[in-house]
Amino acid sequence: MIQFHIEAPDKGLEAALQDKIDNLTKPKGSLGTLEALALQVGLIQQTLSPVLRHPVNVIYASDHGIADEGVSKSPKEVTRQVIHNFLNGGAGVCYLARQHGFELKIVDGGVDFDFPVIPQLIDRKVRKGGTRNFLHEAAMTVEEMEKALQYGADIVTDCYNEGCNVISFGEMGIGNTAASSMWMTCLTQIPLIDCVGAGSGLDSEGVRHKYNVLKRSLENYKGDGSALDVMRYFGGYEMVMAVGGMLRAAELKMIILVDGFIMTNCVLVASRLYPEMQSYCVFGHCGDEAGHKRVLDFLGAKALLDLGLRLGEGSGSVCAYPILDSAVRMINEMHSFKQAAITKYF
């Protein structure tokens, strides 16, 4: 299987970074989370003057066999319809990407549709038709999981080679909140009932049905419970690609902007495999999907925004980017007390 070499950022520069932040013209700590972000980014980049370059939002897309059990309000064909909307620039994340200067990369990891050759669509289809139905069998084979991890990592390598040092991950795949709930309950031991939500808009009866399907799936699972086995048995190709992408981004010392419930569960899996990767993560928002706050708490993560979002696509992480930008501008553009000839007042 693909291996990554991920080290936590060297903290040798921490004192100098903190001193620079503390000596900007403000009361110590008065810019709160911006100061913590500036310190984190400075450590990731190992510099007193960090920069953000060429932000990219990568959207991995695939269909899920479990969707055949009616665990989503939307039918499978919505996945490919939304892909077309991405390509036409009309989706929610598209206007946010335009607003905040992100390049969008759309990756077909296993959508149940034969797209024609489209220059803007990156074809990395692991299996035609998407994953298998994990109510009855593993969603993917070991070989397919390894291929998805590699494909996800390769996309990030391309972004890095194009000058990107801050990357957001989004997803599209009907049924992927169900898959994420399975990852969450298996790897956190949080009861399944607390991991299952409305997804794309199920009513209470729909959520109950979704829970019952997932409960049966959990009862049928006979694996070893390891992160790799749980990822393979219940995951979507787009989710496994995101895990591979996140791990490669951490290996390359890029800043990882984490989106919603699904991407946070991808961090859960990735950090179980390589705990140091979480040092590179900035959690964009706490969404409205049941379980999101619980998995953030499990990871010890504090999200930047709480706007009731549950769209996915990377929309929440792209929304949070200006806060990260403000933190970097703070450490680079604010004057020190000495520069401003102001008496240090703390």
Swiss-Prot record:
<feature type="active site" description="Proton acceptor">
    <location>
        <position position="313"/>
    </location>
</feature>
<comment type="similarity">
    <text>Belongs to the CobT family.</text>
</comment>
<comment type="function">
    <text>Catalyzes the synthesis of alpha-ribazole-5'-phosphate from nicotinate mononucleotide (NAMN) and 5,6-dimethylbenzimidazole (DMB).</text>
</comment>
<dbReference type="InterPro" id="IPR023195">
    <property type="entry name" value="Nict_dMeBzImd_PRibTrfase_N"/>
</dbReference>
<dbReference type="GO" id="GO:0009236">
    <property type="term" value="P:cobalamin biosynthetic process"/>
</dbReference>
<keyword id="KW-0328">Glycosyltransferase</keyword>
<dbReference type="InterPro" id="IPR036087">
    <property type="entry name" value="Nict_dMeBzImd_PRibTrfase_sf"/>
</dbReference>
<keyword id="KW-0169">Cobalamin biosynthesis</keyword>
<dbReference type="GO" id="GO:0008939">
    <property type="term" value="F:nicotinate-nucleotide-dimethylbenzimidazole phosphoribosyltransferase activity"/>
</dbReference>
<keyword id="KW-0808">Transferase</keyword>
<dbReference type="Pfam" id="PF02277">
    <property type="entry name" value="DBI_PRT"/>
</dbReference>
<dbReference type="InterPro" id="IPR003200">
    <property type="entry name" value="Nict_dMeBzImd_PRibTrfase"/>
</dbReference>
<comment type="pathway">
    <text>Nucleoside biosynthesis; alpha-ribazole biosynthesis; alpha-ribazole from 5,6-dimethylbenzimidazole: step 1/2.</text>
</comment>
<protein>
    <recommendedName>
        <fullName>Nicotinate-nucleotide--dimethylbenzimidazole phosphoribosyltransferase</fullName>
        <ecNumber>2.4.2.21</ecNumber>
    </recommendedName>
</protein>
<dbReference type="InterPro" id="IPR017846">
    <property type="entry name" value="Nict_dMeBzImd_PRibTrfase_bact"/>
</dbReference>
